[in-house]
Amino acid sequence: MDEKKRKVTVVGAGAVGSTFAYALAQSGYADEIAITDMNKNFAEGQALDLVQGLPFLPQVDIHAGDKTDYADSDIVVVTAGAKQQSGETRIDLLKRNASIITGIAKDIAESGCSGVMLIVSNPVDILTRAALKASGWERGRVIGSGTVLDTARFRYTLSKECGVDARNIHGYILGEHGDSEFAAWSMTSVAGRRIDEYCSGGVCSSGPHFDKAKILEEVRNSAYHIIDYKGSTYFAVGLALTRIAGAILRNEHSILSVSMTLDGEFGLKDVCLSVPCIVGRSGAERVIESDLPADEQAALEASAKRLKEAFTEMN
């Protein structure tokens, strides 16, 4: 008996969508990757460029697709969005993107898809909440990429400070994927030791009292620096999305800081932001709650307030 194919549909064939498709194809996590775009010829070109590398990849079926691919997809990854036009305000751009994302979300829901919707388009927290509302799905099945990449940047930055492999740094960036995000230092550890304790032995490059504010600033601003250098970010984004997709397709129950609409967790409700979640086949299956210290709880609440205000303004 044939096993069910693990299928991912990518909506939006631009730099982020195509880089994700490329990284996913190399990972071996998916058996089928459909690439869709408003510009069908562009999607065809991206798919053709990828399939010609199939002799170098794990077995995978890559093709250009359309809305009919949603129905049997395990994950639909939405990277589509409008670019800001000259003279267009931030809120007008947000409204245009919300219209695009809600339209896609409705199409996915109406297709009968039983999988997970992963929103990547920015501002990801607001658009994920809009997509959830449009879809009518349960909240764990409509998630955003959130601060998974920000968390990777945080771990990388700390690895330079501590002289330890980034994969052995444990910690999270939480809240908004944006300027109000914060580092959950209370959750940050190396080899089971709190980061402050680990660095107190003088093993970190800045000594026992490293500059936490400077590290957070570096994490927050890293995307801006890359944009200054090359115009946009997509390599690390593609890898972060592949990590999330792998957790879903392989039912890993990994703990990732995806963006999810909260329903009382951390004392917050009706807001979508990044917190540690168990991610498996059905999406974000559970939020991992913890008692945050007062300053981190205040930062989370400030992030939630900012996002709620933006969502209200958009509507």
Curated annotation (Swiss-Prot):
Its EC number is 1.1.1.27. This is L-lactate dehydrogenase. It catalyses: (S)-lactate + NAD(+) = pyruvate + NADH + H(+). Allosterically activated by fructose 1,6-bisphosphate (FBP). Pathway: Fermentation; pyruvate fermentation to lactate; (S)-lactate from pyruvate: step 1/1. Homotetramer. Gene3D superfamilies: Lactate dehydrogenase/glycoside hydrolase, family 4, C-terminal, NAD(P)-binding Rossmann-like Domain. NAD(+) binds at residues 16, 37, 81-82, 120-122, 145. It holds the Pfam family Ldh_1_N. GO terms for cellular component: cytoplasm. The keyword Phosphoprotein applies. One of its GO terms (biological process) is glycolytic process. Belongs to the LDH/MDH superfamily. LDH family. It comes from the Bacteria. It is found in: Cytoplasm. The gene is ldh. CDD domains: LDH_2. Beta-D-fructose 1,6-bisphosphate binds at residues 155, 170. Keywords: Allosteric enzyme, Cytoplasm, NAD, Oxidoreductase, Phosphoprotein. It comes from Treponema denticola (strain ATCC 35405 / DSM 14222 / CIP 103919 / JCM 8153 / KCTC 15104). It is an enzyme of class 1 (oxidoreductase). The modification Phosphotyrosine is found at residue 224. The active site is at residue 177.
